[in-house]
């Protein structure tokens, strides 16, 4: 374990004293460091009447138990403090370590000992081996009582709210859209968990089309075949119009108003970051949206109709929209329990809706936590004029996702009444996505949130993985860079795949979010400042660093070679079929120079930290009137790399007081032969730009530019890079087995590494 402490807020000695005393630690400004430390440690043993016995079982040094040390006249030193601090944080001498000084240094222990009360204050805010901070662990053990009121420590809310006595209620918010065109504004189901208190509370809202269930069997039937020809597209220029995000003014007329919800629930799937803050006094709201189980309308999959329906929930929390107690629309109900301040949460589609909601500029949305979210749906299902499936899901497209999330049809009565109209709508959508050509068009433009980044007012927190080939890093990169310069924004860029990071051992992500939420939603003047970019170092285990930005302008140019080289697109039928059945076998062969590709290896002559988009400038020609080029950059070498999927440790991360416990996790540092750094794909007809389609003349040289997926990746002098240039990608692109070649003039081609 390594300590990477970004949530701790430095305080004055007076504040440290006051906060320690308020929690029941009997420290004194007049007592010695040793006396205060003894009092602190004895308080730690909440379940012991005889704390002498507990102290006897801990050590102050290899020859002295802790009780004997406290009874002696020896002063408290950095070495004793460090050894005891390790035991307080759950580390076991002679098991986890033998040399405490070396162990503390290796773990980057964040506390510089000076004997002050600030040391004890910071120790409480430090992560234990089990994943909770020491203060959260003690509160879960009833250090302080449940009060159903806010208690803050170091600018963060503690788990003082009763999660056994929550309000669990359902309302149906009236949206400004009628997506199924039945003449009624669509209602969306809102599931609410909130503390049982008599004062207004803020809310964490998760907009998830998956929340009420999914229609997987129907979606599977729509999965597209990836085998087929790459079509020649007519040359031309694509024209677009800017979408309008305008909703009619809401009707706020009350109808037989009531103050209590009619509908309750016993259980719903939850998001653990929401659970964590629910125990700390922030309501938790889940909204599936239009076209889902027990909501109304059709699933419009990423357009602003869907977004405005979610926005209506934030409007309702602020008195700007109506909600009903049931879909019969007989009684309206207000959110009289809500302060109106909201943060959105969630990963993938959930993070996507966070991005989209932020671009509405809705009042009340104070903070957005967008984890691995899409910022432009074209960049999820397409790339540079090509069909490019999200990693791991070849054959999926927006129509299959629409069917997957249209859970309204799981209610037989709804199916009976609406399926015919829905199928007509789905057919229109399937045509509009244009799988035939793969081009950007008005349909995709209507689902591009980046163009409205200037409207974002909320503080934005992104998390994204360098190995996320599902929602690729271009999505966070372009949104992060498009936000107004004056806006507060933050990015946690890790080395994982499409994964949550709020229960990772190596970083205090959820505690950082606690501090930021208290500042933005509870108006707590805690002085907290989160760095702009927090990056997980790819070269070592559990190491995080602060960077100034994502995307740099400097570039190191690498000439690709001195001769021409060709890529054969065609495979023998047996190999083509094998790769189609198991795309991982294709990737294995590709990376080890066993597939149809140009494989180029380079040894770096300097240290470099890639930050941005690797750019390829290629001089190419195709033997036919079409073609695509794919590229991947890898670090080669048999050594340890961070694996993309976190390993689960123990089920001991407590999100309250024995509430919604989850598994601690971390990216393992494992031996491997290579690591993918970045990748990209381009239709040769889109070589100029996304909106220009040009003819490809057989055997005529063209100069193309290809920006690969953005990343941050550190390399040392002597490290080996491998650039692989190929055509068909069996994981991502259309599988065209036509017999043609793409030739690259390596002497006129180069790769630029941004740093």
UniProtKB/Swiss-Prot annotation:
Chain segments annotated as transmembrane: none
- What Enzyme Commission number(s) appear in the record? 3.4.14.11
- Molecular function (GO) terms listed? aminopeptidase activity; dipeptidyl-peptidase activity; serine-type peptidase activity
Key words of the record: Aminopeptidase, Cytoplasm, Hydrolase, Protease, Serine protease
Q: Which GO terms describe its cellular component?
A: cytoplasm
One Pfam family linked to the record? PepX_C
What processes does the entry annotate via GO biological process terms? proteolysis
Places the protein is found: Cytoplasm
Matching entries from Gene3D superfamilies are given as: 1.10.246.70, alpha/beta hydrolase, Galactose-binding domain-like
Question: Any keyword Hydrolase?
Answer: yes
> Catalytic center at which residues?
348, 468, 498
First-listed, main subcellular location of the protein, grouped into a coarse class: cytoplasm
Catalysed reaction per UniProt?
Hydrolyzes Xaa-Pro-|- bonds to release unblocked, N-terminal dipeptides from substrates including Ala-Pro-|-p-nitroanilide and (sequentially) Tyr-Pro-|-Phe-Pro-|-Gly-Pro-|-Ile
Q: How does it assemble?
A: Homodimer.
Identify its protein family. Belongs to the peptidase S15 family.
Function comment: Removes N-terminal dipeptides sequentially from polypeptides having unsubstituted N-termini provided that the penultimate residue is proline.
The molecule here is called: Xaa-Pro dipeptidyl-peptidase
Q: Which organism is it from?
A: Streptococcus thermophilus (strain ATCC BAA-491 / LMD-9)
Name the gene behind this protein. Answer: pepX
